[in-house]
C-alpha cells in the first residue's frame, strides 16, 4: 500500500516512517487500518523539529556561538553551527526517530 500523504509529512516524520517501515511494519499496518498514521507522523515531525530547534538554541547559547562571532569570524561561526546542528540531529534521531 502506498502512503501518498508521506510527502505532506516533514523530514523528521519521513525518517521515522522509513524506520518503522523497516523495523516495525506491523505498527504501520495497524495505524493505516485505524487511519492514524498520517497524524502520528505529523506529531512525531513536530516533536522532533521542536526538540531540534531547542537543542540548537541551547547548545549555541552554552558555547557562546552568537551574532558577534558571526560578525567577527563567519567561518568559525559556520563551523560551530554545523557542529551544533549535527549533534542536535544525532540526539533527535536517537531519542525520537529511532525510538
Name the predicted role of every residue range:
Residues 1-99:
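Extended, charged helical/alpha-beta scaffold domains that provide interaction surfaces
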